[in-house]
Amino acid sequence: MAEEESDQEAERLGEELVAIVESPPGPVGLLAAGDGRGGAGGGGCGGGVGISSRDYCRRFCQVVEDYAGRWQVPLPQLQVLQTALCCFTSASASFPDECEHVQYVLSSLAVSFFELLLFFGRDEFYEEPLKDILGSFQECQNHLRRYGNVNLELVTRIIKDGGPWEDPVLQAVLKAQPASQEIVNKYLSSENPLFFELRARYLIACERIPEAMALIKSCINHPEISKDLYFHQALFTCLFMSPVEDQLFREHLLKTDCKSGIDIICNTEKEGKTLLALQLCESFLIPQLQNGDMYYIWELIFLWSKLQLKSNPSKQVFVDQCYQLLRTATNVRVIFPFMKIIKDEVEEEGLQICVEICGCALQLDLHDDPETKCLIYKTIAHFLPNDLEIVRVCALSVFFLERSLDAYHTVEELYRRPDEEYSEGMSTVQNRVRFELLPILKKGLFFDPEFWNFVMIKKNCVALLRDKSAVKLLNENTLENPSSSLKKRVDQQSVEEDQSTGETDPDDASVVQPKGQVNVKRSLSALNTSKVDHSVPRHRCMLCNKEFLGGHIVRHAQAHQKKGSFACVICGRKFRNRGLMQKHLKNHVKKIQRQQIATAQQDDPEVITLEEINGSKSLISFENGNSNTKGLEIETLTASSERNKEVIREHMAEFIKIPIAIPENAIENIIENGKPDASFNNISESLPQCDDDYEEEENEDDYEDDYDLNQETSVLHKINGTVCHPKDVYATDQEGNFKCPALGCVRIFKRIGFLNMHARTVHPTDLNVRQTVMKWSKGKCKFCQRQFEDSQHFIDHLNRHSYPNVYFCLHFNCNESFKLPFQLAQHTKSHRIFQAQCSFPECHELFEDLPLLYEHEAQHYLSKTPESSAQLSEVVPNHQEIDPFSNENQTIHHPVSTSKSRKYSTEPKTYIDTMEKKTDSLVHNGNEHSDDTVSNISLIDQKMPAIEPNPENTHSTTDLVNGHSEIEQTPLVTSDPTLKIDINRNRTENGSILPSVESQEHSALSVSQAPSKPNLTSEQTSYGLIVTKPFVRPLPPSYLDERYLSMPKRRKFLTDIVDACSDQDNMYKKPVKRLRCGKCLTTYCNAEALEAHLAQKKCQTLFGFDSDDESA
C-alpha cells in the first residue's frame, strides 16, 4: 500500500510541476534580468507558454517542499526528489546557463539527496527501488552538466563510490584508527563542509557519540572547516551527552571566544536543546563574573535570564539564581545588567530588589572606582524619583565624587524644592529598605545635610568645586551690584521699625524703587548721619525660616521649646536642658561675630574694636532689660571712620554704668556641678575670648553628651545584674559628691558621668582609676561576659571594643568587627579552623580553644609585678625618685589643653590662676616672653601637685569651710618633688611678674635669690594702671575649721583624711530612735510622723479582731 501511495503522489507531483510551466507569465517586473522566454518545452514538459526562471524556481521549491513534508521516512522522500529532479531537468532546457535561481535549486536538490542517502548502506544501493532512483539521478546530472553545479557533481561521485560512508579515510577517522593529518585534511578539503556537518548531525541523532566526536575533532583541526561554529556546537553537545568528558568540556570552553559562544548558545536553543543552551550560557558567564571581565557580559546575562525562565518559570527561583551569580562576581559593574533583567522580569517586587542590590554594592570598597559609585547613586535616584530625601542625598554624593558644575546645579535644583514629608503608602519600596538605605547613602557624605540649611550646603559645595572658573561664576552670581546694595540700604531704613524688634520677613521684597535721583541722594545723606549699625550679623532660624538681627535669635529660640526637648535654631541640634541649648546657641553668635571682626580687620586696617579702646575688656549689654545671666551677650562694635569712633564712644558712655562681667570658670562651674557657685558674688573679671573655637565646642559637646546620658540616670545602678548604689563604689564627701579616685586628684563631681569622663581623659593610666573601674564592673566585660583578674588586663580588653562595631573577631589576622553578637557568631563559622592569637604585645601564640587563650593572656598580666594602691598612698611626698604623674604624662596621647584643664578644675582660685590670667593678657598684647609663659602654664595645669592637710604645707581646700567661699581662700603654690615653681622677679614692660618653671637642681638657688619682703609695684600703661601685689599666706584659722586644726600631726593626703573623717563621723552617729504604731505596727523615724499617722485614725488592728481586754 505504501508503494502504491508513493507512486500516486509522484504522479500528482509531476502533473503540478508541468502545470507550473504551462501557467501564464507573471508581471514584467517579476522577470529576472537575463531570463529568456522559452519556446516549446522539451522532455516531459511539452511545448507551452514559457515562464521566467525566477517564478518557476520559486513555485517549484514550494511544491516540492509540500510533497516531501508529507513523509517521515527517507525512501518516499527520495522518490519525491526523483520526480522533482526529472521535471526540473525537462523545464530547465529553456533557462540560461548562468542563472542564479537554477543553481540554487540544483544545490538544494543535491544536498537533500545526500542527506537522505545517509540512511542507506552500500548494499542497499543495488536494490530496488533505490537502484532506479540513483540511476535517474545520474541521468539527470548528465543533462544538467552545462550548469556545472559542484554539489550535484559531488553527490554523483559519492553515489559511484558506494555511498556517503564508504570512503577509506572516513572509515579510518570514524573507527579512530591512526591516520596522517595531511591525508585527513586532503579528504576533508575534497568535499563540501556541509556534507560533514550532515554526517555529524546524523551520528549525534543516532547517539553514535564516539564516532561523532572523532569526526568533529578532525573537522575542528582542519584550518578552514574549523571556522564553522557548528562543529564547536556539536562538540559541546557530544561532551554534554557524555558526562565523562567534563575536563574536555572546560578546556574547549576556554578556547572558544565569548562572542562565538553567544552564537553557539542561540543556535543550540533554536534546535530545542534548552538545558544544553542554559548550561553553555552559565559555563561562559560564570568565568566572566569571577574574572571581572565585562566582555559581552550584557548579552550573556540577557540570554541566561531568558533560558532560566524558560527552563523554570518560578520568579523566586530566578531571583535566587541572580543572587547566587552576583556573589561570584568580582566586578561591581555587573549589578547593572542584573538589575535590568530583574526589573524587567520580576516587575513590582523587582524594584525593591534592585534598590537592595545598590545598597549592598555601596557597602563595598569603591574608593578606586568613583565612576561606578556615581552610577550607583544615579541608579538609586532613578529607581526612587519621588523620594526627595534620597534623591537629594544621591545628588550630593554624586557632587562629592564628580565636583563638577553640572552636579552642583542638580544639587541646587533639588534643595530649592520645598521639603516633602515621607509617606510610607506612597513609597515604592518597603519602609525597612528605605531606612536601611539612608545610613548607607550618608556614609559617603562629607557632612550630614539633615542639620544644615541650603546656605551652608551651598557654601561648602562651592568650596569643593575643582573648576576655578565655575567657582568665580557662582560667586559673581551671588554678589550684588552697587545699585542693588543702595536700594537695599534704602529699604532697610524704611523698615527700621521691624529692625527694632529684631525680626525681618524673608519673603518681603528687599528692593524699593527710588522716586528720582533726589530721593536717592536724600536717602544717602540720611544713611550717613544715622547711628544705626547695619553691619550687625543676621541669623536665620532653620526651624521657621525667619531672620533675626544680632543676638535676638537667642530670645527667639524660646518660641520653639518643647517639653523635654530643646533644639538649636541655627544647626538643629537637640538638647534636654534649656541652659545647655542657650549656651550652645550663644557660641554660634560669638563665632559669627569673631569671624566678621576678623574679616573686617583684614579688609580695613583702620577698624577699631573695644579691645583697643578699653584694654581688651568686653562690655556687657542687657538685651532683655534684666540682669539675668542667660540674656547676657558680648557686644563688639566696629568702625571704619571717625564718625563710627564717635558712635563707639557714645555706646561706651551708655554701657559703662554696667561693668558686669562673668568669669569663664564660674560659668563652667555651673555647667559641671549643676548649680551656681559662691564665686558668683565676687565677679570682677570680664569674659575672656576663647583662642580655639573648635576646642571650646568639643568640650561643650562632651559636657552636653554626659548631661544627656546622666539626665535620666537612676540613683541605683546595676553592676552585672546586681543592684548597687554608686556611693558604694566611688568615694563621696559629706554632701554626696563623687571624688576622683586618681592619686593626688581632688576633683569633686555631682554626677558619675562627669567623673567617668574626667577619669578617661585625664587619668587613663592611674592605678586607682583602673581598680575603681574594675570594682564597678566586678571584673566582667559587659560585651563578651569575660571575667578578668587584673585591672590593666581589663582596661586593655575594653579598649578593643571600639564603637560602633564593638564585637570583634578573635581569629588570627581577622580584623572584622560587628554591631550585633549574632553577626559575630555567623562570621566565626566562616573560619574552618578557628585560631585565636594572644592580644598581648610581641606574643604570637595561637589557640584553638578560648579557655586556653584566656588563661594564657592572664599569665602575661599576673607575671607583671602589680603596684598596690596602698603602697602608692604611703609614698612620702618629698621622695625624689617617685613621681605619680610621670607615667600619666607619658601615656596620654592627647594632652589636655589649658582651657580644657581649667574646665576640669574645681579648686579655689590660687596664685597660679592669677598669674595665668595676667600671662594671658601679656600674650594677647604681644609680650616677648609669651611663648615660654604659655608652655609653663600648660605644664602647671597638667601637673598639679598633691595637697596635704598640714597647716604648714596646706595649699588649697576642696570644700567650703566655715562659710568661706573659694575665692576668699588664697593658698600658696605647692612644691612638687619633681617640679619647683619659683616666682622670679622678671618684670615685663607693664610691670607684671612672670612665673617660671625650674628644675629641682635650680630650685634652691631660686628661693635664695627671692627677696623676703617684696614691695608693692605699679606702672602706668597705655590701657590702665597695673598694681602688682605680693602674695601673703593667711593664717590657718582663717580658712580651716577647728576640727582640722586639732587633728594629729600625721602626713596624709587630703583625700584620705576626708575619708577617715567621714568614716569616723559615721561611727559616732547615734542610732536613730524608731517609733511604732500600736495598732498596725508601722514603724516611723520621728514622733511627728507617728502623731500625724495617729491623727488620721485610719489604721486598723493587724489581725482584724478585737483583743480579749477590749471585749471584756
Curated annotation (Swiss-Prot):
Main location: nucleus
Phosphoserine PTM sites in chain numbering: 1107, 1111
Origin: domain of life: Eukaryota
Compartments, record wording: Nucleus
Compositionally biased residues, Polar residues: 886-899, 1002-1018
Composition-biased stretches (Acidic residues): 494-508
Pfam families membership: zf-C2H2, zf-C2H2_ZN292
GO molecular function: DNA binding; zinc ion binding
Keywords: DNA-binding, Metal-binding, Nucleus, Phosphoprotein, Repeat, Transcription, Transcription regulation, Zinc, Zinc-finger
Family: Belongs to the krueppel C2H2-type zinc-finger protein family.
Name of the protein in question: Zinc finger protein 654
